[in-house]
From Swiss-Prot:
InterPro entries linked to this entry: MEMO1_fam
Pfam families to which the protein is assigned, alphabetical: Memo
Species per Swiss-Prot/TrEMBL record: Schizosaccharomyces pombe (strain 972 / ATCC 24843) (Fission yeast)
Family: Belongs to the MEMO1 family.
Record-given protein name: MEMO1 family protein C4H3.04c
GO CC term, one of those recorded: nucleus
Length: 309
């Protein structure tokens, strides 16, 4: 039976398609060559590597794949609307650094489990960058630890889940959280700020979050704090909630601020799954950056952050 190959459709544009050059670039992002024992979870950005690759690498380099048999990859949908978790139909996900084998049996098991999961077409899969941008990073670090070819992946596009669907999916996934042979990659950028994103929230007081949310409309920009500092404050409040509080608290933060964290549902799902599994480890953010420092309302930026557990 022929295998369905998910091609590296964003190679050559979002990241380098040359094996040697991509390897050299990813090596340049590494600070600490030794993974941390037992780290199995990472929140990782999904912009072009020239923008977010360094931040993403700070998380991936901590992952310990020595005992891992399977890596779940959660990513949001940028092109279609769905209320479900859509599982890849591919047999192989291609990268310039080597192929990643998909755990087809588990993908089929997820789809058959309940109404929370369904499968996505190969066209939908290949159009979505949030999953693909994790694949070369994953392949690089698996190869580095001598695990490429030994580990299978489970790519899942996470839709705009209702609370009921979120809980059902989390309960089912909790069994895989408990199993230490599983690792999880959660794909998400943080704040998308600017008129082109329809989001120009300005936070001038981090101590009074609900009262401090303003829509800034002048042509210029505030000076205390500067807009990029406000964006950072806004993101870091959310990051602190991910580190120390519950998935429900994170949901409330998003309702209050409307922060444009594109991977909000993948993040909520992994937090809820950890809670259902009574998993004690918490995410710790280790790197944060912005694509540019916004000072004027006419400017824009995207934030990138990575955390591990």
């Amino acid at each position: 039976m022929s295998q369905a190959i998910r091609e590296a459709t964003h190679a050559g544009s979002w990241y380098l398609d040359d094996t040697e050059l991509l390897t050299k670039q990813l090596k340049s992002f590494i600070k600490n060559p030794t993974p941390e024992t037992g780290k199995r979870f990472v929140i990782s950005p999904h912009a072009g590597y020239m923008y977010s690759g360094k931040v993403a690498s700070q998380g991936f380099q901590q992952l310990d794949f020595s005992k891992i048999q399977r890596v779940f990859v959660f990513g949001p949908s940028h092109h279609i609307f769905t209320r479900k978790c859509l599982v890849s139909r591919a047999s192989i996900c291609s990268t310039p650094l080597g192929d990643l084998k998909v755990d087809e049996d588990l993908c089929q098991k997820l789809v058959a489990s309940d109404n929370s999961f369904d499968s996505m077409t190969l066209d939908v899969d290949e159009s979505e960058h949030s999953l693909e941008m994790q694949f070369p990073l994953l392949a690089f670090h698996l190869l580095k630890q001598g695990c490429l070819g030994k580990v299978k992946i489970v790519p899942i596009m996470i839709g705009a889940l209702t609370s009921t669907t979120m809980m059902a999916a989390a309960k089912f996934l909790s069994q895989y959280i408990k199993d230490e042979s599983n690792s999880f990659v959660i794909s998400s950028d943080f704040c998308h700020w600017g008129r082109r994103f329809g989001y120009t929230l300005y936070l001038n007081d981090t101590n009074q979050l609900e009262d401090a949310v303003l829509k800034y409309k002048r042509r210029g920009g505030p000076t205390s704090p500067k807009i990029y500092e406000s964006i950072s404050n806004l993101d870091h409040i959310g990051m602190k909630i991910i580190e120390t509080k519950s998935s429900d608290d994170f949901s409330e933060y998003l309702k209050t601020t409307q922060n444009t964290i594109c991977g909000r549902y993948p993040i909520e799902l992994i937090m809820k799954s950890m809670e259902c599994a009574n998993f004690s480890e918490r995410f710790k953010f280790i790197s944060y950056a912005q694509s540019s420092h916004v000072e004027l309302v006419t400017d824009s930026s995207v934030s990138y952050a990575t955390a591990t557990a």
